[in-house]
């Protein structure tokens, strides 16, 4: 793409992404620290020598950003790996504890007798597999797709009620629940084609 549609021309997100595409370094060799860039001051670059700082820094940024966000859907953590210290799995776990610690209505996702993750009312979630022809109790028929983000509104005996962005309320059957994952943190791949008010990258 060579025409900017989704972001202001003066945004550092644009200028820095162009540099990346051109194979240019964003910093000088060995530079560490925090710097806000762009005419709009809309990108914070934070570089450090110890990669173990990634997890801590992402958590701190997340805590700060959710204070100002209108919706948890506006704040997105994006990282490259599904497993590991600073991964989708570990960051979703801590983000849930920070954002939605008190919700008691929950549903555990099990695999081989082991809890993989817990879905709670109020959680931000992402659907990971297309599911067609879901019939809601009001008779409406809805499709959901891989990558759809939403908020859990209720958990019933046989379905999870999720308000999906751009779709609305969907009564997702419990049989599909293993494909509903926490969505506070997602991979770069899952984020393709999406847009968010605030992105925390690791």
State each model region's role:
Residues 1-2, 172:
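Hydrophobic residues at beta-strand termini and immediately following loops
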Residues 93-202:
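Conserved nucleotide-binding/hydrolysis modules and their immediate coupling elements
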Residues 2-142:
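Conserved helicase motor core of P-loop NTPases
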């Amino acid at each position: 793409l060579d025409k900017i549609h989704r972001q202001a021309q003066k945004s550092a997100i644009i200028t820095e992404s162009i540099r990346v595409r051109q194979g240019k370094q964003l910093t000088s060799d060995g530079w560490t620290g925090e710097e806000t860039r762009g005419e709009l001051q809309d990108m914070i670059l934070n570089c450090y020598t110890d990669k173990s700082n990634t997890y801590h820094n992402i958590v701190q940024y997340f805590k700060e950003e959710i204070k100002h966000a209108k919706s948890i859907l506006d704040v997105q953590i994006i990282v490259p790996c599904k497993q590991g210290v600073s991964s989708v799995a570990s960051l979703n776990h801590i983000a849930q504890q920070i954002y939605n610690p008190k919700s008691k209505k929950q549903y555990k996702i099990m695999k081989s007798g082991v809890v993989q993750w817990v879905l709670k009312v109020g959680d931000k979630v992402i659907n990971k597999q297309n599911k067609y022809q879901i019939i809601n109790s009001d008779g409406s028929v809805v499709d959901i797709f891989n990558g759809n983000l939403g908020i859990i509104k209720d958990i019933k005996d046989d379905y999870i009620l999720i308000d999906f962005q751009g779709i609305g309320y969907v009564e997702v059957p419990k049989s599909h629940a293993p494909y509903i994952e926490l969505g506070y943190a997602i991979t770069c791949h899952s984020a393709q084609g999406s847009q968010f008010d605030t992105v925390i990258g690791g």
